[in-house]
């Protein structure tokens, strides 16, 4: 099912998003204010998503900086040329999504966490967290919904702070994982009357 197939990638996206928010309190507070304004103390639902565009941008920016599928591979269906190199039918082409998402030609300040860069739609080949074309991740829409719902609910209810000396190191083991986990201090926010 979609839920089982996408649980790891969504969990990784949420871990990286909380890590990034913990290191940028301005982003975290803006996202939390948006979530609290929409949710009013309850858990987010799918119909809340359109009212939380900033949190959607936080998720997209997280996927840009830490795409769970950091590499894509495709098999050439026909002979061609790619960047001046011959490609034979049957060759495997590896596309480094992590590098693409941090390319200075495609992105302004590519190593910076800036959710507002998604106020406009990026070039369709510059942002590929779910792949592209006929092999795009079939669960992309569900994954985005799930990430926005969980992240908004968490940020509305809790404050996340970085623990000095515990920054995770990205490691690629099928998916891009935070080696050693994501360690954060979590404190409850004051509850909004439900």
Identify what each model region corresponds to.
Residues 1-13, 47, 52, 75:
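Conserved cytochrome P450 catalytic core segment spanning the I/J/K helices
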Residues 42-83, 104:
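Conserved cytochrome P450 K-helix E-x-x-R motif and the immediately C-terminal K′/meander segment
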């Amino acid at each position: 099912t979609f839920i089982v197939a996408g649980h790891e990638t969504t969990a990784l996206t949420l871990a990286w998003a909380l890590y990034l928010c913990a290191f940028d309190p301005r982003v975290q507070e803006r996202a939390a204010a948006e979530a609290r304004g929409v949710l009013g103390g309850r858990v987010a639902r799918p119909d809340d998503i359109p009212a939380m565009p900033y949190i959607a941008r936080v998720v997209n920016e997280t996927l840009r900086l830490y795409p769970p599928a950091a590499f894509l591979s495709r098999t050439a269906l026909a002979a061609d040329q790619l960047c001046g190199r011959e490609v034979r039918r049957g060759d495997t082409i590896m596309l480094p999504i992590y590098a693409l998402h941090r390319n200075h030609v495609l992105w302004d300040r590519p190593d910076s966490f800036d959710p507002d860069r998604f106020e406009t739609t990026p070039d369709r080949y510059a942002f590929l967290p779910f792949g592209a074309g006929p092999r795009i991740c079939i669960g992309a829409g569900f994954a985005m919904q799930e990430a926005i719902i969980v992240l908004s609910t968490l940020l509305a209810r809790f404050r996340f702070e970085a623990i000095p000396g515990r920054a995770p190191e990205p490691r690629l083991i099928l998916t891009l994982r935070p080696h050693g986990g994501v360690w954060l201090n979590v404190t409850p926010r004051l509850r909004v009357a439900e």
